């Protein structure tokens, strides 16, 4: 019986040679490197984003997911890393991202029209390698479609990015990667700040409600964190299970709105209206 088991093991290892490293060998929890997400409060909460792992950011619309994405892209491109964004519903605004500090010449933007295209593009980018961050934006995709993505797909992504310097960042409305994600954060909006327009603006725009969005405060809750970190961005004693961060709107001359990268709410409170 033992000889048959040894023979079977040898056959399986031979068949998987070059595709899976030592499938029957025990692997201890690996120590991963973490990098800043560009938001001090998030770094304090998580210790940073783990490389070679899948990180999932979920939350309802207007909860700060896109702002989190822009902040992370700005942080990674500022560190001279090449990043990739897989945009499942072609919702990315490069002008807003550039205003917030993202270096577009270091960003590969893959514009998709459905979830299946986005998943295939993400798979190709991971296999190609060379990216410091690959972001899969499923925020605007119907939740029922994202929910129907088979769990083996997320497992494949996790295994493909493992032992690489790439951060795989998935953004959606619900947590779908389950145990395949090393870090899961749930975002929600807590407060918003508004300011009244000037008399000149009110005269120019008679049908305007007279209020402009100044910014908002989002809360991030840590749902899952399984990565063992080698050099966390923030010390463990300073971390809790949730944190808040603010996003501030920038209004330019053409009255287009953008958002700045997130900042910790401890930097100063804003007036709530």
Where are these regions (language model features)?
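Detector for small/aliphatic-rich hydrophobic stretches
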Residues: 1-85, 266-273
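C-terminal regions of RecA-like/P-loop NTPase motor modules
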Residues: 1-29, 191-273
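Charged, alpha-helix-enriched surfaces in structured cytosolic catalytic cores
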Residues: 34-37, 52, 64-71, 91-92, ...
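Conserved inter-motif catalytic segment of the P-loop NTP-binding fold
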Residues: 60, 71, 79-145
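Hydrophobic/aromatic ligand-binding patch that stacks against planar heteroaromatic rings
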Residues: 75, 96, 160
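P-loop NTPase motor core
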Residues: 110-193
